[in-house]
Swiss-Prot record:
It comes from the Bacteria. PANTHER family: SECY/SEC61-ALPHA FAMILY MEMBER (PTHR10906). It comes from Streptococcus salivarius (strain JIM8777). The chain crosses the membrane at residues 13-33, 65-85, 105-125, 131-151, 157-177, 186-206, 246-266, 285-305, 344-364, 368-388. The keyword Iron-sulfur does not apply. It is found in: Cell membrane. This is Accessory Sec system protein translocase subunit SecY2.
Amino acid sequence: MKKISQSIITKRVLWTLFFLFIYCLGNQLVLPFVDLKNANIFGGAIGSLAFSSAMMGGNLRSMSLFSVGLSPWMSAMILWQMFSFSKKMGLKNLPIEIQDRRRMYLALGIAIVQSLAVSLNLPIVSGVNASLAIFMNTILLIAGTFFLVWLSDLNSLFGIGGSIVILMASMMANLPYQIMDSIEKLGIGWNVLLPLILFSLVFLYVSGVVQRARYRISINKINIHNRFKQYSYLDIMLNPAGGMPFMYAMSLVSIPQYVFMLIQFIHPENKWTSGAIKALTVGQPLWLVVYLVMLFVLGLAFAFVNVSGEQISERMRKSGEYIYGVYPGQETSAYINHLVLRLGFIGALYMLFMAGAPMLIILVNPDYLQLSMIPGTFLIFSGMIYNVNEEMKALKLNTSYTPLFENV
């Protein structure tokens, strides 16, 4: 049994490595007709979006097939979740196939806007029809996004981690560059660097502790002996939203900038679009306010997405379980949702303190932008590693049992 389990894990790890190889290969496929020698290729709006793109599996610095990354798909997922809370729209009552199709349509719409905005702001080599180059690059960027979605689905089926692995690879490829670039720009010496390293280690420890912290609710289960009562419980994370709000907030906040970039190209005479793009550029005060508000809202929203009182209550009702002192059904659902609201509020404040507070330094010096985002990146990274580790534990579960007739 142990050999079989190890074989399954090995196969899944090899598949994941293969998918990562394809992802790295795609990052080397440069978009056609782009003037890479242009000094302003990473400047302006494109340069400001490079960091947020890297958080979502993209790489605007490479100007490759995967430059937009999974941002449209991730934005579509969170928007669909928000629409699903509306009972009037009745999205939850639709068949799964229709829901998936409409989510993809939403992702396609966002991908068109983002890809077109990027293509319109790329420097084109001389002697090439600009309209043709923009059209081809837009189509390639959209195709790259949906190829990454397909690759993530394949990794979920055959590998380990799903889309998380793609995002981790993108972050690991860009984080060292961002750190070194900031250190060189700011001229940071070891007298500042050593305290930063120590702070990072403490931050990782705290984030690991919070990631594992649970609130346990005692549950009465049918046909369970009283001596196992202490093991019968429902646990909810202290931070039910996890580290995902940081990444999704980055994705949602970047959408208006893409839209304004598109409007500016269509109507260049409108001066207000330039002001809007500048105000929503990563690191600007307005961007910071919008980002922190979005971070808090998503911290609460993801808590209810990850822990649904209605679903847990329905599952407990069908299995005959109940919470001590709480009636099954609607009362159980309300009890869990109230608890999730409290924990979600604590988690949202934790996100603001750990990932948002360090970014306030950019109001003093915008050059600290990349360094100020490192705590939030670590927060995402620790959550991703935890999820992958839990998946590995589930795959290894069979090794904890021995065959019934092994010694016969």
